């Protein structure tokens, strides 16, 4: 029986923990997760998604504020004598002392095909950059940020209509199976770790608020990728008030092959032109069509300031938008 301690925090990490719990040859000794956070009305303390699963399975849970400087937690982890630590979206860097504790080391599941998109937000940046394929990589952790030797990979195609939430769900499903397979094969000595080539590395840094701002001078495809990559946070303005843009359709011939049948009528709007940021047409039942720096972009789903998400068509009717008005 392979003895594992799981480190993870958000919903993305939950399928990984569940896959370990369901494997007949793996024993999960306990879970390390981030401290409960105060949220919502009354500032209630809310446990992490991973902690909820751990409690449901009667697992021990440790929640150090700073694991590097928590001698009590470090002593507990040392005494567990785990074979391996499995780490997925934990949220803290692990010290060399922790990395060296388990017999087989610490294995991380990372949401990209390393060495591409090292860093905190690989799912979001792979979408923003317009990648058509991504995946999960398991690696042996070292002291660097996603620089450890690679173990196994699983590729996942990216659809033109995937947003960050959709892709996270896909990767969590494939990644959970990959992590369990990695741990079993590692224990059996069947994997040869492959060092990463630093010359091939690209980065996925922490997302900043300014990344959410839409610049209509950009092309339609670039804006579409930004909206789905940073979903549900991208912003413009409409009549001087903030407008969240949640879903778009690029009216660009190179995207036509990926249109579902329902989008076919939109192709007839491609000839429209106007000033950058201007509403050049309104597609019935869909929404406003905006002129970008290169091509047209339809706003399929939006969230006006102070309101719930709604279709672009509902916004057109609710605000009585007209051709010639400008956004941003």
Swiss-Prot record:
Q: Pfam families per the record? A: Formyl_trans_C, Formyl_trans_N
Q: Which GO terms describe its molecular function?
A: methionyl-tRNA formyltransferase activity
| EC number in record | 2.1.2.9
Top enzyme class: transferase
Q: Where does (6S)-5,6,7,8-tetrahydrofolate bind?
A: 112-115
GO-annotated cellular components: cytosol
Q: Read off the SUPFAM superfamilies from this record.
A: FMT C-terminal domain-like, Formyltransferase
Q: Which UniProt keywords apply?
A: Protein biosynthesis, Transferase
Q: Protein biosynthesis among the record's keywords? A: yes
Under catalytic activity, the entry for this protein gives:
L-methionyl-tRNA(fMet) + (6R)-10-formyltetrahydrofolate = N-formyl-L-methionyl-tRNA(fMet) + (6S)-5,6,7,8-tetrahydrofolate + H(+)
Q: Which Gene3D superfamilies match?
A: 3.40.50.12230
Listed PANTHER family:
METHIONYL-TRNA FORMYLTRANSFERASE (PTHR11138), METHIONYL-TRNA FORMYLTRANSFERASE, MITOCHONDRIAL (PTHR11138:SF5)
Under NCBIfam families, the record lists: fmt (TIGR00460)
Which HAMAP family does the record match to this protein? Formyl_trans
Task: Identify its protein family.
Answer: Belongs to the Fmt family.
Protein's name in the database: Methionyl-tRNA formyltransferase
